[in-house]
Amino acid sequence: MAVVERDSDYYDSSYLADYYESLWTDHAALEDIAVYWAFFKERVLLSQSRVDSKFFLLDVGTGTGRVLHSLIDKAVNDADMSLDAMQFVGMDKSPFMLEQAQRAKQLPQEVRASWFVGTATALEDIASLADPHGKANLLIFAFSGINHLHQPGEIDQFFLSARRVLLPGGLALVSVCAPLLDIEGGDSVPNPYGQVKEVKSKRLEGILYREWETGQKIEGHLFTNSLKTDVVQVSQDGSERVIERNIHNIPLTLLTRDGLRRSAAAAKLEIIEERCIRDEVIFALRAVG
């Protein structure tokens, strides 16, 4: 029986959200949590030293909550940090990803965490749902999420929206895919997400995910990565059956430091630091005024 193929925007099914969770949550190649934790703790301690010690963290494109859950785990186990005044908000455009985020871990009772469907270009909608009178002390847009903003004007809209939800002096931490930053000519780039991946589901017994690249192209400021992802059911005797095949054509924006600086400055955000880790550059931007 032929496998039915479906066009996918990558995380638009429960299986694909589970694949993401199974692949990336504890992936050894990801080194970003240490960077986010350092900025997060510094900002929280600064906030706790003030009369109004309320702290609001907004995680944009939270996915299955990898970054948010990791920071909460560290905060719970840090004697210097008080969770009483903290509020954690995770936002993603995929309800399937948020479903995974909400059930990924049992949060301690004292942790206030909320999850919302939304977009990176209308963050003020999410912030108002979470706290009508509050603004964010810290905003995180992790795992090269900004590269996925590929429609005309979307990156400018993101920065403007980020500034609206940040407190004056608040901080945004924005991850950019290093292989897609400051590209000088050429018609190909290294696949930013690696080659063939095969991973067992952490939650669904007998389910295996297998993904491979089928092509790539560069047109103007866009790099399109084409992939196929199979959802495979593995029987006890080891035989396999593909139960879902997903076809992805993922447009990613090629970015430059100068372009990011201009877009940020137009939104009254100032790049104050950048941290280079494996396959990522994390920019720290401060809300001016």
From Swiss-Prot:
Name of this protein: N-methyltransferase FrzE
EC number: 2.1.1.-
Pathway in which the depicted protein is active: Secondary metabolite biosynthesis
Entry similarity comment: Belongs to the methyltransferase superfamily.
Reaction(s) catalysed (UniProt annotation): (1S,4S)-4-[(4-hydroxyphenyl)methyl]-2,5-diazaspiro[bicyclo[3.2.1]octane-6,1'-cyclohexan]-4'-one + S-adenosyl-L-methionine = (1S,4S)-4-[(4-hydroxyphenyl)methyl]-2-methyl-2,5-diazaspiro[bicyclo[3.2.1]octane-6,1'-cyclohexan]-4'-one + S-adenosyl-L-homocysteine + H(+); (1S,4S)-4-[(4-methoxyphenyl)methyl]-2,5-diazaspiro[bicyclo[3.2.1]octane-6,1'-cyclohexan]-4'-one + S-adenosyl-L-methionine = (1S,4S)-4-[(4-methoxyphenyl)methyl]-2-methyl-2,5-diazaspiro[bicyclo[3.2.1]octane-6,1'-cyclohexan]-4'-one + S-adenosyl-L-homocysteine + H(+)
Top-level EC class as recorded in UniProt: transferase
Domain of life: Eukaryota
Stored InterPro entries: Methyltransf_25 (IPR041698), SAM-dependent_MTases_sf (IPR029063)
Keyword Transferase carried by entry: yes
Biological role stated in the UniProt entry: N-methyltransferase; part of the gene cluster that mediates the biosynthesis of the alkaloid (-)-FR901483, a potent immunosuppressant that shows efficacy in animal models and a probable inhibitor of purine nucleotide biosynthesis by targeting phosphoribosylpyrophosphate amidotransferase (PPAT). Within the pathway, FrzE methylates the amine at position C10'. The biosynthesis of (-)-FR901483 starts with the condensation of two L-tyrosines to yield (S,S)-dityrosyl-piperazine.
UniProt keyword annotations, A-Z: Methyltransferase, Transferase
